[in-house]
């Protein structure tokens, strides 16, 4: 009996019993390799859905925007930012209006050519009055008599470049010398404008001249300075002094005729008002002194460049 059972076991081994299909499994069957991942579910789906908020957002992110206190803080911060921006723009417009600055750069090629000819040959020009349209002065591109800041700015840059070239030709170029030349020219223009403003204020001269107007008229001298230095480099000292005399006379004539329409023309308007204390001869002194000062500045800023 035992022999038959042992022989039966040797010739016919017992087959592994398959697990029941319907009942739960206490242990995983690892004999045929790892089971697929999608068959394992150690956590309930209800628990996972409770941990993840709707919309796929991380916990706590949606609560910030849903919090009334956070929304109020954001609105208050944006209000403070807008108020600060308005205050900054108001202070900037108080000292330098952007719209007024755009007016002085509203030029075109035709205006630039006419203005340069007027600066070099002002003797044949007849009409010096600035034109208006509905109590607003026309832009420089529509009126050659209107002051601009484009020509003074470009002339100042060209003067600095020409000064660097002149110093390089004479083997005297260095960044320090060129920087000193540029700063000196800029400081002289600032001093001239400040003296002009102070004179108008002390003499109680009521005029429509703005600070930008004075900067423009003061900056036109750089055109004559460019001509003077260029002629000095080409023709030596003789060419320099001839160009200096021509550009100085032309600039003085231009300044007198232009400021005459701004300063002297307001005498009749102020004769019945508070500006009557400013006598006409004082206004004439301001105009003539501003024009007579130009040749000395031109000579001071160009003589060291031509040797």
UniProtKB/Swiss-Prot annotation:
Cellular component terms (Gene Ontology): COPII-coated ER to Golgi transport vesicle; endoplasmic reticulum membrane; endoplasmic reticulum-Golgi intermediate compartment; endoplasmic reticulum-Golgi intermediate compartment membrane; Golgi membrane
Record's keyword terms, sorted: Endoplasmic reticulum, ER-Golgi transport, Golgi apparatus, Membrane, Protein transport, Transmembrane, Transmembrane helix, Transport
Record topology, Lumenal segments: 170-184, 237-239
Highest taxon, organism lineage: Eukaryota
Main location: endoplasmic reticulum
Listed GO biological process terms: endoplasmic reticulum to Golgi vesicle-mediated transport; protein transport
Location of the region described as Disordered in the Swiss-Prot/TrEMBL record: 1-42
Localization: Endoplasmic reticulum membrane; Golgi apparatus membrane; Endoplasmic reticulum-Golgi intermediate compartment membrane
Membrane topology: Multi-pass membrane protein
Record bears the keyword Endoplasmic reticulum: yes
Source species of the chain: Danio rerio
Family stated for the protein in its record: Belongs to the YIF1 family.
InterPro entries reported for this sequence: Yif1_fam
Entry function: Possible role in transport between endoplasmic reticulum and Golgi.
Residue ranges, Cytoplasmic side: 1-148, 206-213, 260-285
Record field: transmembrane: 149-169, 185-205, 214-236, 240-259, 286-306
Protein name: Protein YIF1A
Gene that encodes it: yif1a
